[in-house]
Amino acid sequence: IDTSVGRLGVLVCWDQWYPEAARLMALAGADLLLYPTAIGWDPEDVQEEKTRQRDAWVLSHRGHAVANGLPVLSCNRVGHEASPLDASGIDFWGNSHVLGPQGEFIAEAGTEATLLVVDVDLGRSEHVRRIWPFLRDRRIDAYADLTRRYID
């Protein structure tokens, strides 16, 4: 999506888990990756499980930033939503964040509703891509099987 601040690569909710989707956005010229989402956990999960889930979510975003040399902005909802199918519903964990093109935290919200206002240096991506030329050095001739659901 072309905007006044640059080209946004938007991956909504579940799509943000796929590194291929982030890579396609980078190859299409995205200046930053934007991940609007609504992710949380079952309130009955033990704390260790909650921590594992949230940490995996953040780690995947950091990996997308590094692998593509792009900032990642992830905005997640907060609060509880009851479910007619499940008595416990879902607790949304918040933790919206802004990452730089090397996966570093620029800003992070907590578990409450928060407005983050952040300056992101989009020019840094080019510098990072010179240090780590992952897009240049990828072996596209070896990736044909990515278009198949399973490899026989």
Language model regions located:
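Residue-level signal for alpha-helical context at structural boundaries
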Residues: 79, 120-121, 143-146
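Active-site beta-strand termini and strand-to-loop segments that position acidic
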Residues: 1-4, 101, 120
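Generic alpha-helical secondary structure signal
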Residues: 55, 59, 123-126, 141
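Cysteine/selenocysteine-centered motifs that mediate thiol-based redox chemistry or coordinate metal-sulfur cofactors
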Residues: 2-5, 12-14, 23-27, 37, ...
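Alpha-helix N-cap/helix-start capping motif
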Residues: 15-16, 122
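A short, polar/charged loop-to-alpha-helix boundary motif
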Residues: 113-131
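CN hydrolase (nitrilase-like) catalytic-core segments centered on the catalytic cysteine
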Residues: 7, 16-116
